[in-house]
Design a protein with these regions (language model features):
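Repetitive helical segments and hydrophobic/amphipathic motifs
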Residues: 12-13
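Bacterial N-terminal signal peptides that target proteins for export
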Residues: 1-9
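Subset-of-secretome marker
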Residues: 26-281
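C-terminal motif of bacterial Sec signal peptides marking the signal peptidase cleavage site
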Residues: 17-23
Length: 281
């Protein structure tokens, strides 16, 4: 029975992953701290913060720093599985946390190529950096944002700006996030259907809603360049799994869960040609 429960839990977590498509040290003396002079004043108020974010983030694709992209966070929570008559399968739900590490570690390699990437200074960022395929990275307005907060570090060398999107719909999220490719999603679903054939089947997404979308942007104050930006999304996904063959006794289980994941981009604004010239001198 444990194997059957593990198989169902594994499927829940795998479906979540495949259906989803985020510094300077203060110089000190014995008597005083050294602070960095900022290029611009700290923005005050939500509208000013959103405009500030748009200004610095849209400059990334124009100025083309070296970029390193990687997955920053991943989690499955609020799993609810039960029978069609509404009876909860609490044993299945409680087994999910113990299987997360196993499932995530086992699928890590499959995601490395699509989720991890690195570019050199001057490379075109149109495809890699949000919003993929566009010349811009954000078209958010103050009306799109639930909350905005900004804070400088101790020596004022960097500011961390956090934006939480208001009631995130697909159309709204597309104004600042990468949503992924329908072709990639279809290919992933097809692969897992074939692997699980005869044991388990699952429906396509019956519903997918964004419950929270957040952007955390770290900005270098001396020149208003982006040091890093993280895009974090939480999606509530509903699907149905059905046991087949030796797992037929599981029956049909409607399942819903929240899947949180983040992509983070780190920037290096060093121009190699400038560095080479300086060394030659």
């Amino acid at each position: 029975m444990k194997k059957k429960i593990y198989a169902v839990c594994a499927l829940v977590l795998v479906v979540a992953m495949f259906f989803s498509f985020a510094a300077c040290d203060a110089g000190t003396t014995d008597t005083e701290e050294t602070t960095v002079a900022a290029m611009s004043e700290m923005p005050v108020g939500k509208e000013a913060m959103v405009n500030y974010y748009n200004s610095v983030i849209n400059a990334v694709k124009v100025k083309k720093p070296a970029v390193k992209k990687f997955q920053s966070t991943e989690n499955v929570s609020n799993v609810i599985c039960g029978t069609e008559d509404g009876e909860r399968n609490t044993l299945l739900e409680k087994s999910v946390p113990t299987l997360k590490k196993f499932i995530f570690d086992g699928t890590k390699k499959a995601f490395e190529e699509s989720r991890n990437a690195e570019t050199k200074y001057g490379d075109d960022l149109t495809a890699l950096f949000p919003v993929s395929g566009e010349s811009w990275s954000s078209r958010l307005t103050a009306a799109d944002v639930e909350s905005a907060e900004i804070e400088a570090n101790d020596d004022n060398s960097q500011r961390t700006l956090t934006l939480v999107i208001k009631e995130p719909s697909v159309d709204l999220v597309k104004k600042a996030f990468n949503l992924g490719s329908e072709e990639d999603r279809a290919a992933a679903v097809k692969e897992f259907r074939e692997k699980l054939k005869g044991y388990l089947s699952f429906t396509d997404i019956e519903s997918l809603t964004y419950t929270e979308c957040k952007i955390i942007c770290v900005i270098n104050t001396k020149d208003n360049t982006v040091a890093s930006v993280e895009y974090i999304r939480t999606e509530k996904i509903t699907t149905t799994i059905t046991g087949e063959g030796t797992l037929a006794e599981i029956g049909t289980l409607p399942c819903s869960f929240e899947y949180t994941y983040g992509d983070k981009y780190e920037m290096d604004w060093t121009d190699p040609s400038t560095t080479t010239t300086a060394e030659a001198d």
